Each structure stands twice: as structure tokens, then as C-alpha cells.
UniProtKB/Swiss-Prot annotation:
PANTHER family: ADAM A DISINTEGRIN AND METALLOPROTEASE DOMAIN, DISINTEGRIN AND METALLOPROTEINASE DOMAIN-CONTAINING PROTEIN 7. The keyword Transmembrane helix applies. Residues 19-176 form a propeptide. Residues 690-754 are cytoplasmic. One of its GO terms (molecular function) is metalloendopeptidase activity. The gene is ADAM7. Interacts with ITM2B in sperm; the interaction increases following capacitation. Interacts with HSPA5 and CANX. The keyword DNA-binding does not apply. It comes from the Eukaryota. One of its GO terms (cellular component) is plasma membrane. Residues 19-668 are extracellular. It comes from Homo sapiens (Human). This is Disintegrin and metalloproteinase domain-containing protein 7.
């Protein structure tokens, strides 16, 4: 017994020493015990039943740590691998080989500690338990004991007060992203700006030759290391409703594909160019990370472009992979991704309750939470730059059909779903049962406050400008009603423009958005350039052919500005110098052509005024009456009804929209009653006419023969009267059926109304 213990301690020395270098301490030997599951969390639906799974969807492990028994509750990660996942390696000759393994099974989990409200875990069960878990502000690292067959594991405690030997610092390139202008807000725009709407970052990771040599034998060793990192990053970002999904890895086996300079900034520029020109030709992704095992002669451990998500060249990061602890590297990856999503370093008073934040500048220990400052910066970034690539869902259409409590989807039988217990921060929802807590009426929504539905008439979405309406709660739903705005064509900005889809587009504002606040609209003479029919002057683009503007439409083609600066990020600008014959002066006419946008935002925005009662629409200057449909809103509110863009009555602020709905409801009932009465009367008349006709026929049968009767045809204006020799009976005609006429325009007597 004693020799065995001594031998085990000898084996543990290098493993423990390695962790001390990283700054962890207080190791403890544990033997995790797998527990049987008492109940399943799913709702009875099956998923991929035809596939034999090696790893279970849900696990429970008991760990005795510091004289306390912890129960680790783990759920298999479902969203950190994309359905189009690929792996690329290189031969000795430099040839790229790409495979698309159908990964139907993996051993990566996320979870929490049972009965510990503020806890989280990111664990791999591939060969024992390996990963990270947290209880309140204390963080732990667990991994199997090397060369042990008895199931022993080591648990290390991160010391929050001792900085790491390899302390973290990062840098950002000097890069400023311009806000994205647009002629109107699309459904995509509203989704990307929605804080509660789920977003997806399709992540691609490249490992350089040094990382491969250190971890790449066999290949699945490096793969599992990268998967563990992404599982950790995904766990962190799910708190922001972002799913970080790995869509591919590329391993630079045998040699690096770019020169890794001693300057990390130069290396980032070189890598950005390579991934755009080479990697993007064979794989689609939102963000790419280079894991480099080289020191790069710098204390900086990571670098990225601030706010570069979804942009060509700029959605790129580099992380130094110099430490064996994947959680530290993953935390740095999450940190750099935060910069790419518009987040800055946290400085006092931006703090997190659990101590460290993801965006702390030192990044010395794993952090799982974002400060309020980081969250606000991210939400502002969504509004300003609209990174629409984050709306693409990298999973099959039926991926979310697997229903269970904790998937953040409101499935059948659920009143709320705030995600797994370790992620749920909603005080209104019971994360274990997915029902509202006693006494509460709602869990989320603009009309939900303190877990109760707001009263009718409360403003849930204030008016953005003079072309918008404030939305008010209905009193019976936690959701804010659909956004309504003033009817298209309503004069705005002192009659300089007309309202269009809730905005007041003008050329002055568009010039400011394209360039900067110093830019203004140029002289009218510039718009003659739109008759040229090239990329800097046209009205319509059909199959990449630039069609020149007609004379009446020149103010609806490319916009021309003067002053201001253009970021090279958007595209190239062109300045023409034209002579103003009236003032004998030179006029500057500046416009823009985008490199990579499908919609040319250099065209005059739709809805922009191009004359009195005229607006631009698809490169034409048209009368508003032809473009917009308006409505005279009846008095459906208590007072002051206004036309809305959806041809609906919109109540003024302070009135509950219920008043509109009730009035419309009464109106609809009144119309229905009138229609029913008319139908009943019509049926009654029809019955009487049929009975009358039967009576006439009966009299004709019973009466003795009489001489022929002549009847004057009142609908005939000829020289002779028409004589009928048969009984005259009333006939039934549809009220809207016109009498037929002969070639002279005279009505047929048989078709005349009786």
C-alpha cells in the first residue's frame, strides 16, 4: 500500500509542478463517482434515435472536495459544432486535404453544481473528467491523474490574488468602423438589433505549425484541445444570447502558410489578407482565429480588430497558445472575440459580482461573465453596425426540434425558459421546471416589469423621431405591440422630406452617414453625372449593367456630396469637378461605390424627396400617390386618431390601444349584423316570389280558356307592340345583372327588370 502511494506521488510531481507555473494551487486528489439519473429533462421528444450514441445527453458526477460533497450536473453541448464542420490538413508537398467528418457524437458538456445557484462548468468526458468549474467566485480545474487506472483526478484551485506567471495583455489595431447607413430598417435589421434574439458566430480556427508539433500527435489530440476551447467560449457567450459555433479547423502541418513576423500586429495584417484571399474561397465563416505557438517577441498575448465582426479582412484575431491550460487560452479567445464585437477593456467602475470579467485588461484567470459596461457596448454595437452575418443559423432546420426544459425556447407546456440553471439569471422563471414562480404573470418582454405585466397604455417603445409613434402595452401581453410609424408621405423636417417607413430620409443626412458630419449635399449640377451609366453615376443595376438615369430621375440615382472623409472600409469614393455656369465656379461632386455590399448605399435612399409631392423609388422619381397608399383614419380612438403606415388606426400617447381594438371590434360586429339581416330579407323575398309563381300556375290550370291577351312591352320603343300568347308570370332577376341589348342598343324585353 505504502509503495503504491509513494509511486503515485512521484507521478503527480510533474503534473502539480506544471500547474504551479500557471498560478493555480491547492491541488486535491478526488475520485468522481457517476450517479444514476433520477429524471430526464426532456419533454418526451426523441432526437436522432437511429444513431447509437457513445456519450449520454445528461450526466451526474459526485465529487468530494474539501470535506464537502458536490454533484456536477452536465448536459451535452449541442451548439458548439456546426453541421458543416470541416478539417483541413496539409501533406509534405503542401497539398491541402479537407474532410467533413459527420460528427454525430462528442464528449463535451456544460453544466452546473447542484444546489449552487451561482455555478458553472465546462467539462470534457473523453478520457476522464477534464475542464473547468466554478462555485461563486472560486474557480477550479479538474483533470485525470496521468498514468492512473483507478479513476483518480486532481482538482486545482485558481488563486484570485496571485497573478499568473504568464500574465495576459492584448492590443488592438488602430481601426475605426463606420456606422452602417440604410434607406430603411428591414426585418433582418430589427432582428440583429434585438437584444433577446439569438445570434450565432460561425468560428473557424487555424493552428500554426508550432501548435501542431506540440499537440498534434495524434490529430484528435489537437482537435479535442480546440473543441474544449470552443466549448468554453460558447458557455461564456451564451449569457449574451450568442452561440459560438465551430465550423472548421485548419492545421498547418509541416510548415506555416504565412510568415509569422516578430511583430504581432504585422502578423495580424498578413493573416487577415491570407484568410480573405485563400481561406474564404473554400469555407464560409464569421470570424477566424489563428492559434500561434510562437512567442512573436512580444508580451502581448492576443490581438484583434475592434468592432470588425462580419467585415472582410477585419473579422480576425490572433491568440498565443503557449500554455497547457486550455481554459486560459479559451478565455483569451473569448476576450479577443469581445473586442471584435465592440467591447472595450473593463475599467473601474465596470466590475462583475464574481470578481473577474471577461473583458478585464489583465485576463489572468478564467472569467465567465461580462460586465454591464461590456453588455451595453455590445448592444450599442448591434444598433450601430448591424453585423447581419450573426443571423445565419449553422444547424439543420430541425435542430431545435429536440424539446427540453433549458433550451431557451418556449416549448409546449412551458411558461418560460431561461436556459440551464447555471445560465439562468431571470428571477421570474424556475429554471428547473420552466414555469413562472408563484405570484408572477410574466418572465420577459418589454411589457413585463418586476415579473408582472404592465398596465394598458404604458409606453414600451418610445417614438424614435417625428415619423415614429410610441408603442403602448395592451395590458394582457408581456410583448410590446408591433412597431407602428407615421404614414408614408407625411411631411417632416420642415417639409424638407417625407416620412418613409418611420424615418425622414434627406440627402443631407445620407451624406453625413456615408462620410461624416462635415459632409453635405453637393450642387444640383452634380446629378447630371447620373446620365453617364457607370458605377459612379446610374439609376438602376440590372445583371451588373449600370443603367443611366432619365432626365426626370437624375436626383434618384447616385448621391453627390461635398466635404467629409470616407473610410476605406466601405469602398472607394470618386470626386468629379464640374463647372457651375451661373456662378462661374468649380463644384465638387463626391460619391461612393462599395466593394462588398449587395445593396449600393451610395444610391439616393428610397423615400427621399425629389420634388414637391415626389419621392425616389427604385431609381425613379415618382408621384407619392403612385408609390404610397394612405388611409383616412376614422375616429376609432377616444380622440386624436392618426394614420399609421399599416393602414391602421393608431391612438395618440396616453390612450390604450385597446380603445382602437374595441371600436374596430364593435364596427366589425355591426357590419356582420347588417349583412346577416340583408341575407335573411333576401331569402324571405325569394321564398315569397317562388310561392307566388306557384299560385299563378295553379290559377291558370283551374281557369277556363280565354282569348289571347295583348300586353304592351314598356321596354320596347319600336313601331309595333309585341304580343304574348302565354300567361304572364313574375320572373326573378339578380339585382346586379344588366338587361341584355340588341345591336340597336334596345333592351330585350325578356331581360327587363320587373
Amino acid at each position: 500500500m505504502l509503495p503504491g502511494c509513494i509511486f503515485l506521488m512521484i507521478l503527480l510531481i510533474p503534473q502539480v509542478k506544471e500547474k504551479f507555473i500557471l498560478g493555480v494551487e491547492g491541488q486535491q486528489l478526488v475520485r468522481p463517482k457517476k450517479l444514476p439519473l433520477i429524471q430526464k429533462r426532456d419533454t418526451g421528444h426523441t432526437h436522432d434515435d437511429d444513431i447509437l450514441k457513445t456519450y449520454e445527453e445528461e450526466l451526474l458526477y459526485e465529487i468530494k472536495l474539501n470535506r464537502k460533497t458536490l454533484v456536477l450536473h452536465l448536459l451535452r453541448s449541442r451548439e458548439f459544432l456546426g453541421s458543416n464542420y470541416s478539417e483541413t490538413f496539409y501533406s509534405m508537398k503542401g497539398e491541402a486535404f479537407t474532410r467533413h467528418p459527420q460528427i454525430m457524437d462528442h464528449c463535451f458538456y456544460q453544466g452546473s453544481i447542484v444546489h449552487e445557484y451561482d455555478s458553472a462548468a465546462s467539462i470534457s468526458t473523453c478520457n476522464g473528467l477534464r475542464g473547468f468549474f466554478r462555485i461563486n467566485d472560486q474557480r477550479y480545474l479538474i483533470e485525470p491523474v496521468k498514468y492512473s487506472d483507478e479513476g483518480e483526478h486532481l482538482v486545482f484551485k485558481y488563486n484570485l490574488r496571485v497573478p499568473y506567471g504568464a500574465n495576459y495583455s492584448c492590443t488592438e489595431l488602430n481601426f475605426t468602423r463606420k456606422t452602417v447607413p440604410g434607406d430603411n430598417e428591414s426585418e433582418e435589421d430589427s432582428k440583429i438589433k434585438g437584444i433577446h434574439d439569438e445570434k450565432y458566430v460561425e468560428l473557424f480556427i487555424v493552428a500554426d505549425d508550432t501548435v501542431y508539433r506540440r499537440n498534434g500527435h495524434p490529430h484528435n489530440k489537437l482537435r479535442n484541445r480546440i473543441w474544449g476551447m470552443v466549448n468554453f467560449v460558447n458557455m461564456i457567450y451564451k449569457t449574451l444570447n450568442i452561440h459560438v459555433t465551430l465550423v472548421g479547423i485548419e492545421i498547418w502541418t509541416h510548415e506555416d502558410k504565412i510568415e509569422l513576423y516578430s511583430n504581432i500586429e504585422t502578423t495580424l495584417l498578413r493573416f487577415s489578407f491570407w484568410q480573405e484571399k485563400i481561406l474564404k474561397t473554400r469555407k464560409d465563416f464569421d470570424h477566424v482565429v489563428l492559434l500561434s505557438g510562437k512567442w512573436l517577441y512580444s508580451h502581448v498575448q492576443g490581438i484583434s480588430y475592434p468592432g470588425g465582426m462580419c467585415l472582410p479582412y477585419y473579422s480576425t484575431s490572433i491568440i498565443k497558445d503557449l500554455l497547457p491550460d486550455t481554459n486560459i487560452i479559451a478565455n483569451r479567445m473569448a476576450h479577443q472575440l469581445g473586442h471584435n464585437l465592440g467591447m472595450q477593456h473593463d475599467e473601474f467602475p465596470c466590475t462583475c459580482p464574481s470578481g473577474k470579467c471577461v473583458m478585464d485588461s489583465d485576463g489572468s484567470i478564467p472569467a465567465l461573465k461580462f460586465s454591464k459596461c461590456s453588455q451595453n457596448q455590445y448592444h450599442q454595437y448591434l444598433k450601430d453596425y448591424k453585423p447581419t452575418c450573426m443571423l445565419n443559423i449553422p444547424f439543420p432546420y430541425n435542430f431545435h426540434d429536440f424539446q427540453f426544459c433549458g433550451n431557451k425556447k418556449l416549448d409546449e407546456g412551458e411558461e418560460c425558459d431561461c436556459g440551464p440553471a447555471q445560465e439562468c439569471t431571470n428571477p421570474c422563471c424556475d429554471a428547473h421546471t420552466c414555469v413562472l414562480k408563484p405570484g408572477f404573470t410574466c418572465a420577459e418582454g418589454e411589457c413585463c416589469e418586476s415579473c408582472q405585466i404592465k398596465k394598458a397604455g404604458s409606453i414600451c417603445r418610445p417614438a424614435k423621431d417625428e415619423c415614429d409613434f410610441p408603442e403602448m402595452c395592451t395590458g394582457h401581453s408581456p410583448a410590446c405591440p408591433k412597431d407602428q410609424f407615421r404614414v408614408n408621405g407625411f411631411p417632416c423636417k420642415n417639409s424638407e422630406g417625407y416620412c418613409f417607413m418611420g424615418k425622414c430620409p434627406t440627402r443631407e443626412d445620407q451624406c453625413s452617414e456615408l462620410f461624416d458630419d462635415e459632409a453635405i449635399e453637393s450642387h444640383d449640377i452634380c446629378y447630371k453625372m447620373n446620365t453617364k451609366g457607370n458605377k459612379f453615376g446610374y439609376c438602376k443595376n440590372k445583371e451588373n449593367r449600370f443603367l443611366p438615369c432619365e432626365e426626370k430621375d437624375v436626383r434618384c440615382g447616385k448621391i453627390y456630396c461635398t466635404g467629409g472623409e470616407l473610410s476605406s472600409l466601405l469602398g472607394e469614393d470618386k470626386t468629379y469637378h464640374l463647372k457651375d455656369p451661373q456662378k462661374n465656379a468649380t463644384v465638387k461632386c463626391k460619391t461612393i461605390f462599395l466593394y462588398h455590399d449587395s445593396t449600393d448605399i451610395g444610391l439616393v435612399a428610397s423615400g427621399t424627396k425629389c420634388g414637391e409631392g415626389m419621392v425616389c423609388n427604385n431609381g425613379e422619381c415618382l408621384n407619392m400617390e403612385k408609390v404610397y397608399i394612405s388611409t383616412n383614419c376614422p375616429s376609432q380612438c377616444n380622440e386624436n386618431p392618426v394614420d399609421g403606415h399599416g393602414l391602421q388606426c393608431h391612438c395618440e400617447e396616453g390612450q390604450a390601444p385597446v380603445a382602437c381594438e374595441e371600436t374596430l371590434h364593435v364596427t366589425n360586429i355591426t357590419i356582420l349584423v347588417v349583412v346577416l339581416v340583408l341575407v335573411i330579407v333576401g331569402i324571405g323575398v325569394l321564398i315569397l316570389l317562388v310561392r307566388y309563381r306557384k299560385c299563378i300556375k295553379l290559377k291558370q290550370v283551374q281557369s277556363p280558356p280565354t282569348e289571347t291577351l295583348g300586353v304592351e312591352n314598356k321596354g320596347y320603343f319600336g313601331d309595333e307592340q309585341q304580343i304574348r300568347t302565354e300567361p304572364i308570370l313574375p320572373e326573378i332577376h339578380f339585382l346586379n345583372k344588366p338587361a341584355s341589348k340588341d345591336s340597336r342598343g334596345i333592351a330585350d324585353p325578356n331581360q327587363s327588370a320587373k
